[in-house]
Regions:
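Mid-chain, well-packed structural core segment of small domains
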Residues: 58-88
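Short, solvent-exposed beta-strand/turn "edge" segments of beta-rich domains on protein surfaces
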Residues: 50-56, 106
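Acidic-leaning, charged glycine-interspersed low-complexity segments
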Residues: 79-128
Length: 128
């Protein structure tokens, strides 16, 4: 399982109705403000954990940009639930930016949250 697939599984395990996308939100759904959408993009990928003249681990970083549906409530509670689920799979929350309104929209402004997570995986864990 790739790291982004694992993140997708974690998000859907706690919020099955949220839509999760990798690297881009498709045009046909990008304006749907009634559902919470999560955009996952890679922020870091590095080799680490050297031994035997080669690397044995890779460190991954991902940015989760959460576009909350207009009717979504208790955002702090949802974020805590997501953080705990990610931590249970050994993802470390390294940055959690303040929520902000998408002021580029005039007909309904979504709340947006940016979260950075990191995890180091051995090559065996990556099935290499």
């Amino acid at each position: 399982m790739t790291p982004v697939e694992e993140i997708d599984n974690v998000v859907h395990s706690v919020f099955p109705d949220w839509q999760v996308y990798f690297y881009a939100i498709p045009e046909e759904v990008i304006n749907n403000k009634n559902v919470t959408q999560v955009l996952i993009t890679e922020s870091n990928s590095d080799v680490t954990g050297y031994g035997g003249n080669t690397f044995n681990e890779m460190a991954f970083g991902y940015r989760l940009q959460v576009f909350y549906g207009l009717d979504e409530e208790n955002l702090i509670g949802k974020e805590i639930t997501l953080y705990k689920a990610l931590e249970a799979k050994e993802w470390r929350i390294t940055d959690s930016q303040p929520r902000y309104l998408d002021i580029s929209q005039t007909d309904g402004q979504q709340m947006i949250k940016n979260i950075e997570i990191n995890k180091t995986l051995t090559l065996d864990e990556l099935n290499q």
